[in-house]
Swiss-Prot record:
<keyword id="KW-0699">rRNA-binding</keyword>
<dbReference type="Pfam" id="PF00861">
    <property type="entry name" value="Ribosomal_L18p"/>
</dbReference>
<dbReference type="GO" id="GO:0006412">
    <property type="term" value="P:translation"/>
</dbReference>
<keyword id="KW-0689">Ribosomal protein</keyword>
<comment type="subunit">
    <text>Part of the 50S ribosomal subunit; part of the 5S rRNA/L5/L18/L25 subcomplex. Contacts the 5S and 23S rRNAs.</text>
</comment>
<protein>
    <recommendedName>
        <fullName>Large ribosomal subunit protein uL18</fullName>
    </recommendedName>
</protein>
<dbReference type="GO" id="GO:0022625">
    <property type="term" value="C:cytosolic large ribosomal subunit"/>
</dbReference>
<dbReference type="InterPro" id="IPR005484">
    <property type="entry name" value="Ribosomal_uL18_bac/euk"/>
</dbReference>
<dbReference type="InterPro" id="IPR004389">
    <property type="entry name" value="Ribosomal_uL18_bac-type"/>
</dbReference>
<keyword id="KW-0687">Ribonucleoprotein</keyword>
<dbReference type="GO" id="GO:0008097">
    <property type="term" value="F:5S rRNA binding"/>
</dbReference>
<comment type="similarity">
    <text>Belongs to the universal ribosomal protein uL18 family.</text>
</comment>
<dbReference type="GO" id="GO:0003735">
    <property type="term" value="F:structural constituent of ribosome"/>
</dbReference>
<keyword id="KW-0694">RNA-binding</keyword>
<comment type="function">
    <text>This is one of the proteins that bind and probably mediate the attachment of the 5S RNA into the large ribosomal subunit, where it forms part of the central protuberance.</text>
</comment>
């Protein structure tokens, strides 16, 4: 039986491959650590990061000690949507990065979806 880490890596590579072969849009990539959550809008054709937001940002960091929770994920989603809107980005592809679409990932996506079309 495969370990959880191998399953995660396989799921991540499968998702990334589907996104890269089917879409020419920029992608909204999510990363979760044990304490923080990060979101980036990446243009793979130019290999640049257009916008980023995380729980390490001063606007979000001042709210709670526990940083990787649903309330802060919503704030990160709103912040990345605001930065994308100011950069002129209207559509992205959501790259959940191998994480299950549940909890903080879902909260971040729903908050970002208010201003950005997925």
């Amino acid at each position: 039986m495969r370990s959880a880490k191998l399953k995660f890596e396989k799921r991540r590579s499968r998702i990334r491959h589907k996104i890269s072969k089917t879409s020419n849009r920029v992608r909204l990539s999510i990363f979760k650590s044990g304490r923080h959550i990060y979101a980036q809008i990446i243009d793979d054709s130019k290999s640049i990061t257009i916008a980023s937001a995380s729980t390490l940002d001063k606007k979000i960091k001042k709210f709670k000690k526990s940083h990787c929770n649903i309330e802060n994920a919503i704030k990160v989603g709103e912040e990345i949507a605001k930065k994308a809107d100011s950069a002129g980005i209207k559509e992205v592809v959501f790259d959940r990065g191998g994480y299950k679409y549940h909890g903080v990932v879902k909260a971040l996506a729903d908050a970002a979806r208010e201003k950005i079309k997925f």
